[in-house]
């Protein structure tokens, strides 16, 4: 189940939509699986933001975040819901992701927004540039999901396990077009998130099973991911 309102910012004004699309949507599926006694494998996509990192890293042993954001709180409830229904011998897994990037993302998602600004030589306004996040490329995430689908039922955190700062993303994107980002980027504190975590990275141990069982490693992350996004975007008319 990969549907749902996935914007942390938009969830503040769309609390009910966020809850319905994630919690109620998931629960409807689980009730049917339980009633029909189906052994269908069911994955629920979730977010690393539900956890409070230890030394900037997250794993499944981390405590839940105390952040009051509606999206984060909803996904925490969904995480527990999956674990609760798994007790009925259902084949259920939480798949925890960090940032997943794709050129099909909405234009307001950070990396795509920055790359479009750079490619079109346009000025952009951003929030906190001094946070570090773990960005993964969509094609590699899909492959990792397929490999994970053959493994035993439990919860997984899937990410590249590498960090890059917002500032480095901006510098790299504008550099690809021969531009000095300082002339094009301004900061507005209204885009700063409440209770912003400085560093949110998935531990590389989270995906050791992919390396050990399938010899799979993430290759597109950091500066290479920025180049991939930039390359795959056209310029706006």
Regions found by a protein language model. Give the residues of each.
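Conserved Rossmann-fold NAD(P)-dependent oxidoreductase catalytic core, especially the SDR/UDP-sugar
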Residues: 1, 27-70
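NAD(P)H-binding glycine-rich loop region in Rossmannoid oxidoreductase-like domains
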Residues: 1-20
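Active-site beta-alpha turn of Rossmann-fold NAD(P)-dependent dehydrogenases/reductases
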Residues: 3, 43-46, 53, 68, ...
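Short-chain dehydrogenase/reductase
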Residues: 26, 30, 79-83, 142-145, ...
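Flexible, glycine-rich beta-alpha linker
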Residues: 50-52, 66-70, 93-113, 132
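Active-site Tyr-X1-5-Lys
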Residues: 53-55, 66-93, 115-120
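C-terminal substrate-binding subdomain of Rossmann-fold SDR/epimerase-dehydratase oxidoreductases
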Residues: 112, 118-237
């Amino acid at each position: 189940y990969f549907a749902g309102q996935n914007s942390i910012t938009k969830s503040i004004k769309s609390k009910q939509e966020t809850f319905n699309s994630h919690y109620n949507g998931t629960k409807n599926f689980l009730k049917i699986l339980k009633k029909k006694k189906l052994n269908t494998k069911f994955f629920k996509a979730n977010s690393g933001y539900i956890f409070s990192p230890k030394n900037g890293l997250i794993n499944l042993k981390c405590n839940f975040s105390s952040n009051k954001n509606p999206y984060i709180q909803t996904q925490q409830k969904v995480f527990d819901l999956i674990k609760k229904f798994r007790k009925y011998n259902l084949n259920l897994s939480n798949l925890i992701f960090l940032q997943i990037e794709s050129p099909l993302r909405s234009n307001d998602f950070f990396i795509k927004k920055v790359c479009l600004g750079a490619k079109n030589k346009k000025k952009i306004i951003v929030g906190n540039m001094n946070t570090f996040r773990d960005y993964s490329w969509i094609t590699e995430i899909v492959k990792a999901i397929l490999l994970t689908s053959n493994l035993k039922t439990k919860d997984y955190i899937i990410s590249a396990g590498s960090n890059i700062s917002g500032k480095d993303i901006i510098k790299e994107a504008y550099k690809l077009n021969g531009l000095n980002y300082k002339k094009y980027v301004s900061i507005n504190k209204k885009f700063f998130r409440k209770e912003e975590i400085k560093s949110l990275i998935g531990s590389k141990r989270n995906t050791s099973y992919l390396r050990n069982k399938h010899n799979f490693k993430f290759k597109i992350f950091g500066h290479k991911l920025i180049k991939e996004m930039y390359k795959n975007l056209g310029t706006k008319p």
